[in-house]
């Protein structure tokens, strides 16, 4: 497992930190956790291709955690992405999906699935389990855990 912190700042940018975004490279996949507005630039600095991202997990809908998502999706489309992308988030993700599509310039030529989730196991493969848990914040907020399954 390789974890890259793209941003760890709060809602206000600073000279040295960017809005939240974390990349997990594991199990032959690249997963993004939160997508602050500087995510694309930070991916370039980290030499991580956004085209390799297979899943995006959003913790909550404050702007510093999600405002990079519309631009990232548009850039993936401009770059000719074809493979599906799955986006997970707490209740309210369908409103985010509708907002992205209503921006006027958004038409995507690759499949995007928006999945609203709550606490519990949200994804299980032969190699790993991803769980979410609601945590204290002033809005619905999910924390995520990734558990690697034991190999026989």
Task: Please identify what each model-predicted range represents.
Residues 1-152:
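Binuclear metal-dependent hydrolase catalytic cores
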